[in-house]
């Protein structure tokens, strides 16, 4: 019987001679390769889309997108202060701010210690500034920056008292707070209870409540502008080239009323600081990153993560880094007071006296809380905006760069011998700028201070460099699309 040629092919072979199983494997490989190619193409397309439109990525993928692109996957709209031409009062305040004739020496103005070129901080690396009638007197503290003070509340102890016409009894508030355990500060976490600590106010010790109150201080300080009395200031104001502007705004009789003249002059200085956007520009790279308009480098992004890490730097425990719910940009301070135990600065002339101690809230420059010794050694937490522009750091100007500052935080407790000097017997003089009876006030519970001598520091050298890279993104004047 004749059979077709196909009938002679074994059942496991196709006509071409390939086993069916082999062909099936080839087919499967093709499917897998095709699927892999599709996945890769999709991943590439997704990555490209994420790179261009990171803000459109699902929230669940935010961390991944942030790490890959350096962009903020959840941008926000920041509510910056409104910009408008300066009012006549603010323009008058600007004249006063730059007027050297108001000092006893005739050579010093507000801007001498608060330079616009240095974010309204000193334009030199001196630990304290030189002033006085003959420009020969050394100060006691480095002048803080005048930027980002427009939201500063008056000094209080415990929760903000809000608007009230009733004078606040600080001694009574201090007594009420004395029995309350200090709340631990944790980055990106709200405290479990209201913080019963000093907060708000101006100067390192909070002794002024408003910009107007703060402005008069240097004018009559014997180591600053050195006028002997407020009346001396009024006399100088009455001979300025802008006295006619005072008369136009407040009436011709103001020149004969020293108290009113000074009050209106200091109000004008305060208005200048409120209205001029250079005092609170919010034009840093970080601001634009928050808005999705700029991207952080890997080092800057890692630095931000460490800044916000409660177990690492924990900087955001005091230097708040997140916008408010209604979009107010962060000013990088909780405006509270801390005793950090920074080492004594021998470069300050006053410190040559071994009995002199600058103890912040409890003296010597404010006396109303001198008996509240639980606050000795506490100083205002400053903003970190424009911190990379500063040339001295902390209330005594003991450090001159951010690396030294970060080393202090990292090594104060783990390697105190690297931070503090030794006495004649070789013992490390820890917290040597604070009398021994107040050492318990120093923060030793919040990271990175929650470690003991010999422990591993919270941050590596690489971590510190990345944090510094992030801190530099807080400088105003960043141009979107460039540096």
Cite the ranges covered by each PLM segment:
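Periplasmic c-type cytochrome electron-transfer domains
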Residues: 2-483
